[in-house]
């Protein structure tokens, strides 16, 4: 466990759109980290890299060049394929996100077709993860890493779009239960 100051931001009430938060992160997105040097990090991966350098005992991003490369590769894959697909589905169907289909300070209309495509992409990515986890305990190594965290959070987030892990995908299901 690391000890850093945190502040909760109430997304349900759009607190991230308030002036105080916009001054910290004009993109109006979470998470965000303000470093000791007052630099702003607003992407999860950059925050993790910063924290791992500050607290090297964490070692979730790998200990060798090979392991680091594999972990970052999978994190980027999960971000660009699974998280985006879930976001497309959720942000283009949720009544709470009407006119907020994309994060940030500007409003964007929902496009229902993107939700349909997003759901199909989620199903396809489940197949990829299931194959990748076949006969393995973890995604990138013989131990729990940031790649497992990224994938777990994304797979768990599919509950928001009511897309469960299919029963036949035992590799993915077993891994999900193991890391939960």
What are these model-derived regions, one by one?
Residues 22, 69-72, 150, 173, ...:
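Generic structural signal for individual residues within well-ordered alpha-helical segments
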Residues 1-4, 162, 180:
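Proteins with a high burden of low-complexity, intrinsically disordered sequence enriched in S/T/G/P/A and R
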Residues 1-116:
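GST-like domain detector, emphasizing the conserved glutathione-binding G-site
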Residues 81-178:
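GST-like fold's C-terminal all-alpha helical module
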């Amino acid at each position: 466990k690391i000890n850093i100051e945190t502040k909760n931001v109430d997304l349900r009430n759009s607190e991230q759109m308030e002036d105080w938060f916009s001054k910290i992160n004009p993109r109006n997105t979470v998470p965000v980290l303000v470093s000791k040097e007052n630099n702003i990090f607003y992407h999860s991966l950059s925050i993790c890299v910063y924290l791992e350098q500050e607290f090297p005992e964490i070692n979730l991003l790998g200990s060798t060049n090979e392991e680091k490369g594999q972990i970052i590769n999978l994190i980027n894959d999960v971000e660009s394929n699974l998280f985006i697909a879930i976001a497309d589905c959720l942000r283009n169907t949720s009544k709470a996100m009407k006119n907020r289909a994309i994060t940030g300070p500007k409003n964007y209309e929902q496009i229902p077709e993107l939700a349909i495509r997003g759901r199909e992409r989620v199903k396809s990515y489940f197949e990829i993860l299931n194959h990748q986890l076949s006969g393995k305990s973890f995604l990138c190594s013989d131990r729990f890493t940031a790649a497992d965290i990224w994938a777990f959070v994304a797979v768990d987030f599919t509950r928001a779009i009511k897309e469960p892990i299919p029963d036949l995908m035992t590799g993915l299901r077993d891994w999900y239960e193991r890391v939960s």
